[in-house]
Amino acid sequence: MRFTSNMAQIIDGKAIAQEVRTQLAHELKGMEAAGYPKPHLTAVIVGEDPASEKYVANKMVACREVGISSETKRLPASTTQEELLQLIADLNKDPQVTGILVQLPVPEHINERTICNAVDVDKDVDGFNEVNIGRTALDMEANIPATPLGVKRLLEHMKIETLGRNAVVVGRSKNVSLPMAILLHADGKYATKAMDATVTICHRYTPPKELARHCRQADIIVVAVGKPGLITKDMVKPGACVIDVGINRIKDESTGQFKLVGDVDFEEVRQVAGHITPVPGGVGPMTVAMLMHNTLKAARKQFDDRKSS
């Protein structure tokens, strides 16, 4: 890790994700040659959220590139929780379906946690079932949520030292921030590779002065709150690695067009950081790539379990 720099090295998540997808395509060919059936991922969208449609479309493109069979099931926003649960139960029982993801968010009348927990643990490629979250927390074998797993892969690819380093995770979502903190502090005694960082979690109730203080002490900052420009230049230690998970759609006043930005003031922070991820093109592509990783992993486990039973 560099601790002094005139300008941060931009972490090209798009290029790294392409490497991962290429590796996975090669791995899948090996699996099929060994007699494994083709993995099949089913995505479920409830309602007509344009962002959800785009995210799922990107996942389907990645499936085709890797060689994974896939389909998208679209349900109207009026779908009841019971109807969605029945669909998930049917997919759980279908041996041809090896991966299931329910694109979040779901309509307000549907309980997100209930839906995540309804997905079979072994087919839960998002890693959102409470069993997978619990296994991740205990450093056990699990389907780890794709975004924090993608961040971990980025850090490893860039050879960012984590052993004994101070890491700050800004945000406390159960699907991203919590498993991210868990991965950063993992000691490697069980299934999860050690990262051995000293981890601090900050959130909306962390006073701004305290947030700034914690960030200034951090060698690694991972921010995922959905607040444009939250992390500023004065909050970052020179040479720190800044990972921006935020995705915010804002209007560019100079052009009148909408654009995507993260939670980090990118142009300012890159002047002091050692490494930084852009938005778009940073964490997002890695999330999709690691979802493909989880899908292959899930398919292999299910086939192996059937052979041994």
From Swiss-Prot:
List, separated by semicolons, the cofactors it needs.
Answer: Mg(2+)
Keywords for this protein:
Hydrolase, Magnesium, Mitochondrion, Multifunctional enzyme, NAD, One-carbon metabolism, Oxidoreductase, Transit peptide
CDD domains, from UniProt?
Answer: NAD_bind_m-THF_DH_Cyclohyd (cd01080)
Q: Where in the cell is it found?
A: Mitochondrion
Respond yes or no to whether keyword Mitochondrion is given for this record. yes
One GO BP: tetrahydrofolate interconversion
User: What Pfam families does the database record attribute to this sequence?
Assistant: THF_DHG_CYH (PF00763), THF_DHG_CYH_C (PF02882)
Entry-linked SUPFAM superfamilies: Aminoacid dehydrogenase-like, N-terminal domain, NAD(P)-binding Rossmann-fold domains
Q: Which InterPro entries match?
A: Aminoacid_DH-like_N_sf, NAD(P)-bd_dom_sf, THF_DH/CycHdrlase, THF_DH/CycHdrlase_cat_dom, THF_DH/CycHdrlase_CS, THF_DH/CycHdrlase_NAD-bd_dom
* A GO CC annotation given for this chain: mitochondrion
Q: PROSITE patterns per the record?
A: THF_DHG_CYH_1, THF_DHG_CYH_2
Single GO MF annotation: methylenetetrahydrofolate dehydrogenase (NAD+) activity
Coiled coil feature spans: none
EC number(s) reported in the record: 1.5.1.15, 3.5.4.9
Q: Which superkingdom is the protein from?
A: Eukaryota
Q: Which reaction does it catalyse?
A: (6R)-5,10-methylene-5,6,7,8-tetrahydrofolate + NAD(+) = (6R)-5,10-methenyltetrahydrofolate + NADH; (6R)-5,10-methenyltetrahydrofolate + H2O = (6R)-10-formyltetrahydrofolate + H(+)
Q: What does this protein do?
A: May play a role in spermatogenesis.
**Additional record remark:** This NAD-dependent bifunctional enzyme has very different kinetic properties than the larger NADP-dependent trifunctional enzyme and is unique in that it requires formation of an enzyme-magnesium complex to allow binding of NAD.
- Summarize subunit and interaction data from the UniProt record for this chain: Homodimer.
What family is it from? Belongs to the tetrahydrofolate dehydrogenase/cyclohydrolase family.
Can you say what this protein is called? Answer: Bifunctional methylenetetrahydrofolate dehydrogenase/cyclohydrolase, mitochondrial
Q: Which organism is it from?
A: Drosophila melanogaster (Fruit fly)
